[in-house]
């Protein structure tokens, strides 16, 4: 079965993102296809490369990045939500005159069209 996941919670402070990550791992382990994860609202904080958890805490931002690298799962970030929350790639940083970017490698700024496409091409969309 083909799945897409929508994450609306930040990497830390709520259970949404970590539950979504565990669900993603379980899907892959059970042989399902996870085509994409779409980060929306506060979920865009999962793509902030400046997140720095304590050494004894799980690094969820890097875990999402590894999921992308190992399994080819698309990690799409809502561009409007990201810009409102200060998560930008190099292109947007330059366009907005910002000193630097902070989008973690493996994540892609995209519009709601990416979510719509995932919804149309998947058997199930699960929101956290």
UniProtKB/Swiss-Prot annotation:
HAMAP family: Thiourid_synth_D (MF_00390). This is Sulfurtransferase TusD. It is found in: Cytoplasm. NCBIfam families: PRK00207.1, sulf_tusD_dsrE. The keyword tRNA processing applies. InterPro entries: DsrEFH-like, Sulphur_relay_DsrE/F-like, Sulphur_relay_TusD/DsrE. GO terms for molecular function: sulfur carrier activity; sulfurtransferase activity. It comes from Escherichia coli (strain K12). Heterohexamer, formed by a dimer of trimers. The hexameric TusBCD complex contains 2 copies each of TusB, TusC and TusD. The TusBCD complex interacts with TusE. Keywords: Cytoplasm, Transferase, tRNA processing.
């Amino acid at each position: 079965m083909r799945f897409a996941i929508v994450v609306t919670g930040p990497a830390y402070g709520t259970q949404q993102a970590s539950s979504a990550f565990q669900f993603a791992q379980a899907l892959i382990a059970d042989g399902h296809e996870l085509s994409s994860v779409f980060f929306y609202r506060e979920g865009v904080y999962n793509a902030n490369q400046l997140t720095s958890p304590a050494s004894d805490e799980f690094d969820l931002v890097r875990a999402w990045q590894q999921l992308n690298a190992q399994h080819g799962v698309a990690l799409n970030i809502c561009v409007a939500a990201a810009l409102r929350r200060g998560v930008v790639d190099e292109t947007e940083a330059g366009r907005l005159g910002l000193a630097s970017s902070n989008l973690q490698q493996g994540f892609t700024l995209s519009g709601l069209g990416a979510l719509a496409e995932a919804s149309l091409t998947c058997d199930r969309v699960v929101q956290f």
